[in-house]
Regions:
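C-terminal extensions of enzymes
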Residues: 81-151
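Glycine-rich phosphate/ribose-binding loops and adjacent secondary-structure elements
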Residues: 1-80
Length: 151
């Protein structure tokens, strides 16, 4: 279904569900989907996207999406994500991770999966901080714009 339809259904269902119970959205999805769900009252998510995309060389970062198979990372010896949420982010470089993917080393998939899972945990934690601070509605659009960027 189109994402706009999914968001519409989340809003519809959340009007019906008891307000004092947690809301769970299964199988969703991208970091942007998660933020949109949170904005609409969803409390819990699960999905395979962080690990599936990681296994295919796609990394979610605070500044956007990285395809580690792209040639542009071949000589980029900077950390995977300088201020990332996981130990793998500063332990390995983009060039090394790209090399591992092209060499079809299983370690590439593990590093990317650890990175993406840590990123999702960071994102949910940041959303919570901004909800508590009362500025989620101004933080979210800025974050969505950053997360949409292809690096």
């Amino acid at each position: 279904e189109p994402t706009e339809k999914m968001y519409e259904m989340i809003e519809l269902v959340n009007e019906i569900l008891p307000k004092d119970k947690p809301r769970y959205l299964m199988g969703v999805g991208t970091p942007i989907n998660i933020l949109e769900g949170i904005e609409r009252g969803v409390d819990m998510f699960d999905c395979v996207m962080p690990t599936r995309n990681g296994r295919n060389g796609m990394l979610f970062t605070k500044d956007g999406i990285i395809n580690m198979r792209n040639k542009k990372w071949e000589t980029d010896f900077s950390p995977i994500e300088a201020n990332g949420a996981s130990y793998v982010d500063t332990l390995y470089t983009k060039a090394y991770l790209r090399h591992l993917f092209h060499a079809q080393e299983l370690l590439a998939m593990q590093i990317a999966s650890v990175h993406n899972l840590a990123f999702y945990l960071w994102l949910a934690g940041e959303a919570r901080k901004h909800i508590i601070a009362g500025d989620f509605s101004t933080w979210k659009p800025m974050m969505v714009k950053r997360l949409s960027t292809r690096l």
